[in-house]
UniProtKB/Swiss-Prot annotation:
The gene is Ass1. One of the enzymes of the urea cycle, the metabolic pathway transforming neurotoxic amonia produced by protein catabolism into inocuous urea in the liver of ureotelic animals. Catalyzes the formation of arginosuccinate from aspartate, citrulline and ATP and together with ASL it is responsible for the biosynthesis of arginine in most body tissues. Its EC number is 6.3.4.5. It is found in: Cytoplasm, Cytosol. The modification Phosphotyrosine is found at residues 87, 113. NCBIfam families: argG (TIGR00032), PRK00509.1 (NF001770). The keyword Nucleotide-binding applies. L-aspartate binds at residues 119, 123-124. It comes from Mus musculus (Mouse). This is Argininosuccinate synthase. Pfam families: Arginosuc_syn_C, Arginosuc_synth. The modification N6-acetyllysine is found at residues 112, 165, 176. It catalyses: L-citrulline + L-aspartate + ATP = 2-(N(omega)-L-arginino)succinate + AMP + diphosphate + H(+). GO terms for biological process: acute-phase response; argininosuccinate metabolic process; aspartate metabolic process; cellular response to amine stimulus; cellular response to amino acid stimulus; cellular response to ammonium ion; cellular response to cAMP; cellular response to dexamethasone stimulus. Acetylated by CLOCK in a circadian manner which negatively regulates its enzyme activity. Deacetylated by histone deacetylases.
């Protein structure tokens, strides 16, 4: 059979993408396996050997950890991005980072196709493909889990396991695996299996990135986090003097400290982009600390009315990231506006990390809008209390008129 061409497969080494690699070869494609190192615990050399053994023409293992932090996580920190008030977007942020490098490899290798193992029911298929089409409009995407010849053949995990046995694909898991996991620097997500019943509590052994808060140390770690333009540039542990200043090391250290204290666990039901609700359990240790610390320094340094507008932009940014529109013109516009809002977000925040919680202890900034003398109950300063009378009268006018009308309506 003549080759249909080369396809760059986003390969994880797990059951799905290992089977997809072999299946793509069956369909006549030359497969280039691409594995992104985005901070997950993985034996990358073992994954390389496995992909080559399964017939990959080439294997690329790309370390994108630093760019993931600086180009994706930092904008999320600046925006205080939360999807549906709770989700810090760990998976959502990783997908455009992974897919961007996948497209670069495809262009470099002259491959017309890219492929992924995302299911036809989830968000990741959208995130991967919108990135690919944005960066390489001519690219063709092979999405096996949306192709009848694939999903009719493999109706579930058991069928994949049987296919793996037939083709000598070494798989470390069994059909009884109780949930699926996805890990990167930002977080670990757990879903599917026994977690699909939203009433089922997460088993104690599920969590791998954070300590059980009840078993966490009995004394807190106090951290000082320094921000410039809304981005963390330095973290210092007040207890032992440990300091980190480079983006990747800083973020990894916060993961370590927060994980030790059980910070960053959530169990939620969220609305997927395609319309269904899903249950997800997430551990986001460093991201949780930075979310709270950044909120604090931002409130300390940013004008009230600017912050109201910025909060709306942050909500829109979270929605765009979650739904896969990282490379859209509207997301570029929102990111630019948020970055503008962060120009004066500078200073240091002290936080206590303890038993699953992050407590703000204090903050300082050379650009603070906080005026201690003006706000003091003991010093009058430039503020005339009598001026508040007119302020209240003007603001009460609308309320008086509204309730005057309501009284007339009620009387009728």
């Amino acid at each position: 059979m003549s080759s249909k061409g080369s396809v760059v497969l986003a390969y994880s080494g797990g059951l799905d993408t290992s089977c997809i690699l072999v299946w793509l070869k069956e369909q006549g494609y030359d497969v280039i396996a691409y594995l992104a190192n985005i901070g997950q615990k993985e034996d990358f050399e073992e994954a390389r050997k496995k992909a080559l053994k399964l017939g990959a023409k080439k294997v690329f293992i790309e370390d994108v950890s630093k760019e993931f932090v600086e180009e994706f996580i930092w904008p999320a920190v600046q925006s205080s991005a939360l999807y549906e008030d709770r989700y810090l977007l760990g998976t959502s942020l990783a997908r455009p980072c992974i897919a961007r490098r996948q497209v670069e490899i495809a262009q470099r290798e002259g491959a017309k196709y890219v492929s992924h193992g995302a299911t036809g029911k989830g968000n990741d298929q959208v995130r991967f493909e919108l990135t690919c089409y944005s960066l390489a409009p001519q690219i063709k995407v092979i999405a096996p889990w949306r192709m009848p010849e694939f999903y009719n053949r493999f109706k579930g995990r058991n069928d994949l396991m049987e296919y793996a046995k037939q083709h000598g694909i070494p798989i470390p898991v069994t059909p009884k695996s109780p949930w699926s996991m996805d890990e990167n620097l930002m977080h670990i997500s757990y879903e599917a299996g026994i977690l699909e019943n939203p009433k089922n509590q997460a088993p104690p052994g599920l969590y791998t990135k954070t300590q059980d808060p009840a078993k966490a140390p009995n004394s807190p770690d106090v951290l000082e986090i320094e921000f410039k333009k809304g981005v963390p540039v330095k973290v210092t542990n007040i207890k032992d003097g440990t300091t980190r200043t480079t983006s990747l090391e800083l973020f990894m250290y916060l993961n370590e400290v927060a994980g030790k204290h059980g910070v960053g666990r959530i169990d939620i039901v969220e609305n997927r982009f395609i319309g269904m609700k899903s249950r997800g359990i997430y551990e986001t240790p460093a991201g949780t600390i930075l979310y709270h610390a950044h909120l604090d320094i931002e409130a300390f340094t940013m004008d009230r009315e600017v912050r109201k507008i910025k909060q709306g932009l942050g909500l829109k940014f979270a929605e765009l990231v979650y739904t896969g529109f990282w490379h859209s013109p509207e997301c570029e516009f929102v990111r630019h506006c948020i970055q503008k809002s962060q120009e004066r977000v500078e200073g240091k925040v002290q936080v206590s990390v303890f038993k699953g919680q992050v407590y703000i202890l204090g903050r300082e900034s050379p650009l603070s809008l906080y005026n201690e003398e003006l706000v003091s109950m003991n010093v009058q300063g430039d503020y005339e209390p009598i001026d508040a009378t007119g302020f209240i009268n003007i603001n009460s006018l609308r309320l008086k008129e509204y309730h005057r009308l309501q009284s007339k309506v009620t009387a009728k």
